[in-house]
Curated annotation (Swiss-Prot):
GO biological process, one term: selenocysteine biosynthetic process
GO MF: ATP binding; serine-tRNA ligase activity
Binding site for ATP: R259, K260, E261, V275, E349, V350, T351, S352
Pathway(s) it belongs to: Aminoacyl-tRNA biosynthesis; selenocysteinyl-tRNA(Sec) biosynthesis; L-seryl-tRNA(Sec) from L-serine and tRNA(Sec): step 1/1
Function: Catalyzes the attachment of serine to tRNA(Ser). Is also able to aminoacylate tRNA(Sec) with serine, to form the misacylated tRNA L-seryl-tRNA(Sec), which will be further converted into selenocysteinyl-tRNA(Sec).
Keywords annotated in UniProt: Aminoacyl-tRNA synthetase, ATP-binding, Cytoplasm, Ligase, Nucleotide-binding, Protein biosynthesis
Subunit description: Homodimer. The tRNA molecule binds across the dimer.
Annotated protein name in UniProt: Serine--tRNA ligase
Amino acid sequence: MLDLKFIRDNLDLVKKSIKARGLVLDIDKLVYLDDKRKKIITQIGELNAKRNENSSKMRENLDNVFKSSLMETGKILKKQLIDLEEELKKISFDFDLENKRVPNILSPDVPIGNSEEDNFEIKKVGVVPKFDFKPKDHLELGRDLDLLDFDRAREVSGSKFYYLKNEAVFLEIALINFSLNKLREKGFDVFITPDVAREFIVDGIGFNPRGDESNIYKIESTDKYLVGTSEITLGGYYYNKIIDLTLPIKMAGFSHCFRKEAGAYGQLSKGLYRVHQFSKVEMFCFCKAEESQVIHDEFLSIQEQIFTELEIPYRVLNICSFDLGSPAYKKYDIEAWMPGRDGKGSYGEVTSTSNCTDYQSRRLKIRYKDQDGQNKFAHMVNGTAIATTRVIISILENFQDEKGGVRIPKSLVKYTGFGYIPFKN
Protein backbone atom coordinates (compact mmCIF):
# COMPACT_ATOMS: atom_id res chain seq x y z
CA MET A 1 0.00 0.00 0.00
CA LEU A 2 0.98 3.63 -0.34
CA ASP A 3 1.85 6.06 2.43
CA LEU A 4 -1.32 7.97 3.30
CA LYS A 5 0.47 11.30 3.50
CA PHE A 6 1.87 10.62 0.02
CA ILE A 7 -1.66 9.92 -1.25
CA ARG A 8 -2.99 13.17 0.23
CA ASP A 9 -0.08 15.19 -1.16
CA ASN A 10 -0.25 13.55 -4.61
CA LEU A 11 -3.94 12.92 -5.24
CA ASP A 12 -3.75 13.65 -8.96
CA LEU A 13 -0.77 11.31 -9.45
CA VAL A 14 -2.52 8.49 -7.57
CA LYS A 15 -5.76 9.02 -9.50
CA LYS A 16 -3.79 8.95 -12.76
CA SER A 17 -2.27 5.57 -11.81
CA ILE A 18 -5.68 4.15 -10.92
CA LYS A 19 -7.18 5.29 -14.22
CA ALA A 20 -4.22 4.07 -16.29
CA ARG A 21 -4.52 0.60 -14.74
CA GLY A 22 -8.21 0.39 -15.64
CA LEU A 23 -9.24 0.16 -11.98
CA VAL A 24 -12.40 1.59 -10.44
CA LEU A 25 -11.55 3.18 -7.10
CA ASP A 26 -12.81 6.35 -5.39
CA ILE A 27 -9.68 7.82 -3.82
CA ASP A 28 -11.71 10.73 -2.43
CA LYS A 29 -13.71 8.19 -0.42
CA LEU A 30 -10.46 6.96 1.14
CA VAL A 31 -9.53 10.52 2.17
CA TYR A 32 -13.06 11.04 3.56
CA LEU A 33 -12.85 7.81 5.60
CA ASP A 34 -9.44 8.83 6.92
CA ASP A 35 -10.75 12.23 7.99
CA LYS A 36 -13.74 10.63 9.68
CA ARG A 37 -11.53 8.05 11.38
CA LYS A 38 -9.22 10.75 12.75
CA LYS A 39 -12.19 12.80 13.95
CA ILE A 40 -13.61 9.83 15.86
CA ILE A 41 -10.18 9.08 17.39
CA THR A 42 -10.02 12.70 18.58
CA GLN A 43 -13.55 12.44 20.03
CA ILE A 44 -12.64 9.22 21.83
CA GLY A 45 -9.59 10.93 23.31
CA GLU A 46 -11.70 13.85 24.51
CA LEU A 47 -14.32 11.54 26.04
CA ASN A 48 -11.64 9.50 27.80
CA ALA A 49 -10.23 12.71 29.27
CA LYS A 50 -13.71 13.70 30.52
CA ARG A 51 -14.26 10.21 31.91
CA ASN A 52 -10.94 10.31 33.77
CA GLU A 53 -11.80 13.74 35.17
CA ASN A 54 -15.21 12.45 36.24
CA SER A 55 -13.63 9.41 37.94
CA SER A 56 -11.17 11.65 39.79
CA LYS A 57 -14.00 13.79 41.17
CA MET A 58 -15.84 10.69 42.38
CA ARG A 59 -12.89 9.81 44.60
CA GLU A 60 -13.32 13.10 46.47
CA ASN A 61 -15.40 13.46 49.63
CA LEU A 62 -18.74 14.45 48.07
CA ASP A 63 -22.36 14.53 49.15
CA ASN A 64 -24.59 11.78 47.81
CA VAL A 65 -26.52 13.98 45.38
CA PHE A 66 -23.38 15.24 43.63
CA LYS A 67 -21.85 11.76 43.67
CA SER A 68 -25.00 10.33 42.10
CA SER A 69 -24.82 13.01 39.39
CA LEU A 70 -21.21 12.07 38.65
CA MET A 71 -22.13 8.40 38.44
CA GLU A 72 -24.86 9.20 35.92
CA THR A 73 -22.39 11.30 33.91
CA GLY A 74 -19.95 8.36 33.99
CA LYS A 75 -22.60 6.03 32.55
CA ILE A 76 -23.38 8.48 29.76
CA LEU A 77 -19.69 8.90 28.92
CA LYS A 78 -19.18 5.12 28.92
CA LYS A 79 -22.13 4.64 26.54
CA GLN A 80 -20.82 7.39 24.24
CA LEU A 81 -17.37 5.75 24.23
CA ILE A 82 -18.81 2.33 23.40
CA ASP A 83 -20.80 3.82 20.51
CA LEU A 84 -17.80 5.75 19.17
CA GLU A 85 -15.46 2.76 19.46
CA GLU A 86 -17.97 0.64 17.54
CA GLU A 87 -18.23 3.34 14.89
CA LEU A 88 -14.42 3.58 14.75
CA LYS A 89 -14.18 -0.17 14.28
CA LYS A 90 -16.55 -0.02 11.29
CA ILE A 91 -14.91 3.07 9.76
CA SER A 92 -11.43 1.56 10.24
CA PHE A 93 -12.53 -1.65 8.51
CA ASP A 94 -13.89 0.31 5.54
CA PHE A 95 -10.76 2.49 5.49
CA ASP A 96 -8.38 -0.49 5.52
CA LEU A 97 -10.37 -2.14 2.73
CA GLU A 98 -10.18 0.94 0.52
CA ASN A 99 -6.54 1.62 1.43
CA LYS A 100 -5.46 -1.87 0.37
CA ARG A 101 -7.14 -1.42 -3.01
CA VAL A 102 -5.03 1.61 -3.91
CA PRO A 103 -2.35 0.47 -6.41
CA ASN A 104 1.25 1.59 -6.57
CA ILE A 105 2.07 4.66 -8.63
CA LEU A 106 3.55 4.13 -12.09
CA SER A 107 7.10 4.68 -13.26
CA PRO A 108 7.13 7.62 -15.71
CA ASP A 109 8.28 5.32 -18.54
CA VAL A 110 5.46 2.77 -18.19
CA PRO A 111 3.45 2.71 -21.46
CA ILE A 112 -0.15 3.79 -20.91
CA GLY A 113 -2.55 1.36 -22.54
CA ASN A 114 -5.28 -1.22 -22.01
CA SER A 115 -4.16 -4.25 -24.04
CA GLU A 116 -1.06 -6.29 -24.83
CA GLU A 117 -0.73 -4.33 -28.08
CA ASP A 118 0.21 -1.35 -25.92
CA ASN A 119 3.23 -3.11 -24.39
CA PHE A 120 6.44 -1.55 -25.68
CA GLU A 121 8.89 -3.92 -27.38
CA ILE A 122 12.39 -2.99 -26.25
CA LYS A 123 14.28 -5.51 -28.38
CA LYS A 124 14.34 -8.93 -30.00
CA VAL A 125 17.22 -11.35 -29.44
CA GLY A 126 18.11 -14.52 -31.34
CA VAL A 127 17.12 -15.98 -34.67
CA VAL A 128 13.66 -17.47 -35.08
CA PRO A 129 14.16 -20.99 -36.53
CA LYS A 130 13.06 -21.78 -40.07
CA PHE A 131 12.18 -25.41 -40.65
CA ASP A 132 12.30 -27.26 -43.98
CA PHE A 133 9.61 -29.57 -42.62
CA LYS A 134 6.25 -28.96 -40.94
CA PRO A 135 7.07 -28.33 -37.26
CA LYS A 136 4.99 -29.91 -34.52
CA ASP A 137 3.68 -28.16 -31.44
CA HIS A 138 4.71 -29.35 -27.97
CA LEU A 139 1.57 -31.48 -27.59
CA GLU A 140 2.43 -33.51 -30.69
CA LEU A 141 6.07 -33.73 -29.66
CA GLY A 142 5.10 -34.72 -26.13
CA ARG A 143 3.01 -37.56 -27.53
CA ASP A 144 5.50 -38.74 -30.16
CA LEU A 145 8.46 -38.62 -27.76
CA ASP A 146 6.47 -40.08 -24.83
CA LEU A 147 7.14 -37.03 -22.65
CA LEU A 148 3.68 -35.73 -21.69
CA ASP A 149 0.37 -37.29 -20.71
CA PHE A 150 -2.59 -34.95 -20.36
CA ASP A 151 -5.25 -37.64 -20.84
CA ARG A 152 -4.35 -39.69 -17.77
CA ALA A 153 -3.80 -36.53 -15.72
CA ARG A 154 -7.30 -35.36 -16.69
CA GLU A 155 -8.71 -38.63 -15.35
CA VAL A 156 -6.69 -38.45 -12.13
CA SER A 157 -6.61 -34.72 -11.34
CA GLY A 158 -8.84 -32.86 -13.81
CA SER A 159 -8.20 -30.54 -16.73
CA LYS A 160 -5.02 -28.47 -16.98
CA PHE A 161 -2.94 -31.01 -15.07
CA TYR A 162 -0.30 -33.19 -16.71
CA TYR A 163 2.24 -35.93 -16.23
CA LEU A 164 5.85 -35.29 -17.23
CA LYS A 165 7.47 -38.55 -18.34
CA ASN A 166 10.89 -39.95 -19.20
CA GLU A 167 13.33 -37.32 -20.56
CA ALA A 168 10.88 -34.49 -19.73
CA VAL A 169 11.36 -35.26 -16.02
CA PHE A 170 15.12 -34.82 -16.30
CA LEU A 171 14.64 -31.74 -18.46
CA GLU A 172 12.56 -30.04 -15.76
CA ILE A 173 15.08 -30.94 -13.05
CA ALA A 174 17.91 -29.73 -15.30
CA LEU A 175 16.22 -26.35 -15.78
CA ILE A 176 15.80 -25.98 -12.03
CA ASN A 177 19.43 -26.89 -11.31
CA PHE A 178 20.72 -24.73 -14.16
CA SER A 179 18.92 -21.63 -12.89
CA LEU A 180 19.65 -22.20 -9.19
CA ASN A 181 23.36 -22.69 -9.88
CA LYS A 182 23.47 -19.51 -11.97
CA LEU A 183 21.79 -17.51 -9.21
CA ARG A 184 24.04 -18.96 -6.52
CA GLU A 185 27.07 -17.92 -8.58
CA LYS A 186 25.61 -14.40 -8.69
CA GLY A 187 25.42 -14.17 -4.91
CA PHE A 188 21.82 -15.20 -4.27
CA ASP A 189 20.90 -17.20 -1.16
CA VAL A 190 19.05 -20.30 -2.40
CA PHE A 191 15.81 -21.61 -0.86
CA ILE A 192 13.22 -24.31 -1.30
CA THR A 193 10.18 -22.44 -0.05
CA PRO A 194 6.87 -23.63 1.47
CA ASP A 195 4.04 -24.19 -0.98
CA VAL A 196 1.57 -22.78 1.56
CA ALA A 197 1.28 -19.27 3.01
CA ARG A 198 -0.97 -17.60 5.57
CA GLU A 199 -3.66 -15.24 4.33
CA PHE A 200 -2.09 -12.11 5.81
CA ILE A 201 1.17 -12.82 3.94
CA VAL A 202 -0.69 -13.38 0.65
CA ASP A 203 -2.62 -10.17 1.30
CA GLY A 204 0.58 -8.35 2.22
CA ILE A 205 2.25 -9.25 -1.06
CA GLY A 206 -0.77 -7.70 -2.75
CA PHE A 207 -2.38 -10.45 -4.78
CA ASN A 208 -5.46 -8.35 -5.47
CA PRO A 209 -7.74 -9.80 -8.16
CA ARG A 210 -9.39 -7.37 -10.60
CA GLY A 211 -12.73 -9.03 -9.95
CA ASP A 212 -14.16 -11.16 -7.17
CA GLU A 213 -12.25 -14.29 -8.17
CA SER A 214 -8.82 -15.00 -6.73
CA ASN A 215 -6.35 -16.88 -8.94
CA ILE A 216 -4.94 -18.95 -6.06
CA TYR A 217 -6.42 -21.80 -4.05
CA LYS A 218 -7.58 -21.34 -0.46
CA ILE A 219 -7.23 -24.36 1.81
CA GLU A 220 -10.68 -25.02 3.21
CA SER A 221 -11.32 -24.23 6.91
CA THR A 222 -7.90 -22.56 7.31
CA ASP A 223 -6.32 -19.14 6.90
CA LYS A 224 -3.86 -20.60 4.37
CA TYR A 225 -3.45 -20.64 0.59
CA LEU A 226 -1.46 -22.69 -1.90
CA VAL A 227 1.06 -20.22 -3.31
CA GLY A 228 0.85 -19.07 -6.91
CA THR A 229 4.56 -18.16 -6.78
CA SER A 230 7.39 -18.22 -4.23
CA GLU A 231 7.33 -14.42 -4.45
CA ILE A 232 4.72 -14.79 -1.69
CA THR A 233 6.85 -16.84 0.69
CA LEU A 234 10.13 -15.07 -0.10
CA GLY A 235 8.45 -11.69 0.33
CA GLY A 236 7.03 -12.76 3.68
CA TYR A 237 10.35 -14.11 4.97
CA TYR A 238 11.18 -10.90 6.88
CA TYR A 239 7.63 -10.06 7.95
CA ASN A 240 7.60 -7.45 10.73
CA LYS A 241 11.41 -7.26 10.86
CA ILE A 242 14.01 -4.51 10.71
CA ILE A 243 16.67 -5.89 8.37
CA ASP A 244 20.28 -4.99 7.61
CA LEU A 245 20.47 -3.63 4.08
CA THR A 246 24.13 -2.66 4.06
CA LEU A 247 24.02 -4.83 0.93
CA PRO A 248 20.85 -5.88 -0.93
CA ILE A 249 19.44 -9.23 0.20
CA LYS A 250 19.07 -11.43 -2.90
CA MET A 251 17.12 -14.67 -2.63
CA ALA A 252 16.34 -17.45 -5.10
CA GLY A 253 13.41 -19.69 -4.28
CA PHE A 254 12.22 -22.94 -5.83
CA SER A 255 8.57 -23.85 -5.33
CA HIS A 256 5.60 -25.47 -6.94
CA CYS A 257 3.00 -22.94 -8.07
CA PHE A 258 -0.76 -23.46 -8.00
CA ARG A 259 -3.17 -21.30 -9.99
CA LYS A 260 -6.88 -21.54 -10.78
CA GLU A 261 -6.52 -19.97 -14.23
CA ALA A 262 -10.30 -19.57 -14.40
CA GLY A 263 -11.53 -19.08 -17.95
CA ALA A 264 -8.07 -19.68 -19.44
CA TYR A 265 -8.98 -21.81 -22.42
CA GLY A 266 -8.37 -21.62 -26.15
CA GLN A 267 -5.55 -22.04 -28.62
CA LEU A 268 -3.09 -19.73 -26.84
CA SER A 269 -3.56 -21.46 -23.47
CA LYS A 270 -3.35 -25.08 -24.59
CA GLY A 271 -1.07 -27.78 -23.23
CA LEU A 272 1.66 -26.76 -20.82
CA TYR A 273 1.27 -23.04 -21.46
CA ARG A 274 -1.41 -22.42 -18.82
CA VAL A 275 -1.80 -25.10 -16.17
CA HIS A 276 -2.95 -25.41 -12.57
CA GLN A 277 0.43 -26.59 -11.22
CA PHE A 278 4.00 -25.99 -12.31
CA SER A 279 7.51 -25.58 -10.91
CA LYS A 280 9.34 -22.27 -10.82
CA VAL A 281 12.55 -20.65 -9.62
CA GLU A 282 11.96 -17.07 -8.49
CA MET A 283 14.38 -14.21 -7.82
CA PHE A 284 13.65 -11.80 -4.97
CA CYS A 285 15.48 -8.84 -3.49
CA PHE A 286 15.11 -6.56 -0.48
CA CYS A 287 17.02 -3.34 -1.00
CA LYS A 288 17.22 0.37 -0.17
CA ALA A 289 14.92 2.79 -1.94
CA GLU A 290 17.66 4.19 -4.14
CA GLU A 291 18.76 0.70 -5.28
CA SER A 292 15.54 -0.87 -6.57
CA GLN A 293 15.72 0.45 -10.12
CA VAL A 294 19.27 -0.89 -10.54
CA ILE A 295 18.25 -4.27 -9.07
CA HIS A 296 15.24 -4.40 -11.39
CA ASP A 297 17.48 -3.91 -14.43
CA GLU A 298 19.90 -6.51 -13.03
CA PHE A 299 17.08 -9.07 -12.74
CA LEU A 300 16.15 -8.45 -16.37
CA SER A 301 19.79 -8.92 -17.37
CA ILE A 302 19.93 -12.27 -15.54
CA GLN A 303 16.75 -13.40 -17.28
CA GLU A 304 18.26 -12.47 -20.63
CA GLN A 305 21.44 -14.39 -19.81
CA ILE A 306 19.39 -17.48 -18.98
CA PHE A 307 17.49 -17.47 -22.28
CA THR A 308 20.57 -16.59 -24.29
CA GLU A 309 22.39 -19.59 -22.79
CA LEU A 310 19.34 -21.74 -23.52
CA GLU A 311 19.61 -20.58 -27.18
CA ILE A 312 15.92 -19.61 -27.22
CA PRO A 313 14.89 -16.57 -29.32
CA TYR A 314 13.07 -13.99 -27.21
CA ARG A 315 11.88 -10.43 -26.99
CA VAL A 316 11.79 -7.97 -24.07
CA LEU A 317 8.68 -5.91 -23.31
CA ASN A 318 8.04 -2.90 -21.09
CA ILE A 319 4.55 -3.79 -19.85
CA CYS A 320 1.71 -1.30 -20.19
CA SER A 321 -0.25 0.14 -17.29
CA PHE A 322 -3.34 -2.07 -17.65
CA ASP A 323 -1.32 -5.29 -17.36
CA LEU A 324 0.52 -4.30 -14.18
CA GLY A 325 -0.48 -5.89 -10.88
CA SER A 326 -1.35 -3.47 -8.08
CA PRO A 327 2.08 -3.73 -6.36
CA ALA A 328 4.15 -3.10 -9.51
CA TYR A 329 5.74 0.28 -10.19
CA LYS A 330 7.24 -1.10 -13.39
CA LYS A 331 7.40 -4.52 -15.04
CA TYR A 332 9.38 -6.18 -17.81
CA ASP A 333 8.33 -9.40 -19.53
CA ILE A 334 10.42 -11.74 -21.64
CA GLU A 335 8.50 -13.63 -24.30
CA ALA A 336 10.11 -16.65 -25.93
CA TRP A 337 9.51 -17.73 -29.51
CA MET A 338 7.26 -20.79 -29.62
CA PRO A 339 6.97 -22.22 -33.18
CA GLY A 340 3.79 -24.18 -32.38
CA ARG A 341 1.95 -21.34 -30.67
CA ASP A 342 -1.26 -20.15 -32.33
CA GLY A 343 -0.75 -22.62 -35.17
CA LYS A 344 1.83 -20.47 -36.91
CA GLY A 345 4.36 -19.54 -34.23
CA SER A 346 4.41 -16.52 -31.94
CA TYR A 347 6.02 -15.18 -28.79
CA GLY A 348 4.71 -16.31 -25.39
CA GLU A 349 5.49 -14.97 -21.93
CA VAL A 350 8.15 -16.94 -20.04
CA THR A 351 9.39 -14.48 -17.38
CA SER A 352 8.43 -11.24 -15.71
CA THR A 353 10.26 -8.97 -13.30
CA SER A 354 8.64 -6.21 -11.25
CA ASN A 355 9.91 -3.34 -9.14
CA CYS A 356 7.30 -3.03 -6.37
CA THR A 357 9.15 -0.22 -4.50
CA ASP A 358 7.90 -0.09 -0.88
CA TYR A 359 4.31 -1.07 -1.70
CA GLN A 360 4.60 -4.60 -0.27
CA SER A 361 6.96 -3.79 2.60
CA ARG A 362 4.46 -1.31 4.08
CA ARG A 363 1.89 -4.06 4.31
CA LEU A 364 4.41 -6.56 5.66
CA LYS A 365 6.18 -4.08 8.00
CA ILE A 366 9.64 -4.81 6.58
CA ARG A 367 12.01 -1.96 7.41
CA TYR A 368 15.67 -0.97 7.41
CA LYS A 369 17.62 1.85 9.04
CA ASP A 370 18.94 4.58 6.76
CA GLN A 371 22.27 6.38 7.29
CA ASP A 372 20.59 8.68 9.81
CA GLY A 373 19.26 5.75 11.83
CA GLN A 374 15.67 6.34 10.71
CA ASN A 375 13.41 3.40 9.92
CA LYS A 376 12.50 3.21 6.23
CA PHE A 377 10.42 0.66 4.36
CA ALA A 378 12.52 -1.67 2.19
CA HIS A 379 12.05 -1.79 -1.56
CA MET A 380 11.18 -5.21 -2.98
CA VAL A 381 11.95 -6.53 -6.47
CA ASN A 382 10.90 -9.91 -7.89
CA GLY A 383 11.51 -11.81 -11.11
CA THR A 384 11.12 -15.23 -12.70
CA ALA A 385 14.32 -17.17 -13.28
CA ILE A 386 12.69 -20.28 -14.75
CA ALA A 387 9.04 -21.31 -15.07
CA THR A 388 9.69 -24.87 -16.21
CA THR A 389 6.57 -25.69 -18.22
CA ARG A 390 6.85 -22.77 -20.64
CA VAL A 391 10.57 -23.27 -21.10
CA ILE A 392 9.94 -26.94 -21.89
CA ILE A 393 7.49 -25.77 -24.59
CA SER A 394 10.17 -23.49 -26.02
CA ILE A 395 12.86 -26.17 -26.03
CA LEU A 396 10.69 -28.87 -27.59
CA GLU A 397 9.32 -26.61 -30.32
CA ASN A 398 12.50 -24.68 -31.20
CA PHE A 399 14.94 -27.61 -31.22
CA GLN A 400 12.91 -30.29 -33.00
CA ASP A 401 14.41 -31.79 -36.15
CA GLU A 402 13.21 -33.55 -39.30
CA LYS A 403 13.74 -36.95 -37.64
CA GLY A 404 11.08 -36.09 -35.06
CA GLY A 405 13.55 -35.76 -32.20
CA VAL A 406 14.60 -32.78 -30.09
CA ARG A 407 18.09 -31.42 -29.40
CA ILE A 408 18.87 -30.31 -25.84
CA PRO A 409 20.55 -26.89 -25.45
CA LYS A 410 24.28 -27.30 -24.75
CA SER A 411 24.03 -25.44 -21.43
CA LEU A 412 21.65 -28.11 -20.09
CA VAL A 413 23.43 -31.29 -21.22
CA LYS A 414 25.60 -31.53 -18.10
CA TYR A 415 22.39 -31.44 -16.04
CA THR A 416 20.25 -33.78 -18.17
CA GLY A 417 22.95 -36.33 -18.94
CA PHE A 418 21.77 -36.51 -22.57
CA GLY A 419 21.87 -34.17 -25.54
CA TYR A 420 19.04 -35.52 -27.67
CA ILE A 421 15.52 -36.93 -27.25
CA PRO A 422 14.85 -39.40 -30.09
CA PHE A 423 11.52 -40.01 -31.81
CA LYS A 424 9.71 -43.04 -30.37
CA ASN A 425 7.53 -45.20 -32.62
